[in-house]
């Protein structure tokens, strides 16, 4: 067993104080907003489709989907304890403790969602992961995969804060690997600034001004920056299977 496998086997025990939150209501609100502001515009055509979440954790995303009327929901995760919580949260009996590679080989979906999982997969398995996602989608199906953004100002933290992180992506490299199989590929910022309150609108405005100032400073230094998404902590690829 590799060091990564040992940590993943005891992931919640070893990293629980870093990744868990006691405020379940706040955590659910975060996923409700993430879905509403970042995902919904891409997935609204799949409300009647068969949907899989890879790495469904404690069911926050699935619960958010239920709140918007999505019903044909499936989830997989390696943590049995998290799945137990997810089942209680969502009432779904379609959640399984299963490896993504195994599940994708034998099932078909219209929409596949995956947040903060791909970076944990070994680099020499990354292409296989994308290929299995492609093969598992029905014609017209879509995959949305979210990962940490290596162009972010604090990207070193995202890359190395977790020993089990195997690879990091920028918007260019994320598009590269998905275009090996998908013809329709776009990469978007997965911003965590949700404009749903006066306070957050003010923060968003201040953030916009700060980003412009940083870009200007980098131009003065001769470093460009017009093509670097340094202000976004995460990015998401939206890939559609047209044929």
PLM features per residue range, with description:
Residues 2-34, 78, 122-136, 142-242:
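S-adenosyl-L-methionine-dependent methyltransferase catalytic module, highlighting the catalytic core
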Residues 72, 140-141:
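Short acidic capping loops at alpha-helix termini that bridge into adjacent secondary structure
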Residues 115-117, 147-148:
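Short loop/turn segments at strand-loop or loop-helix junctions that form parts
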Residues 1-107, 111-115, 124-130, 189-192, ...:
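Conserved N-terminal segment of class I S-adenosyl-L-methionine
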Residues 102, 119, 152:
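Active-site micro-motifs of SAM-dependent methyltransferase domains
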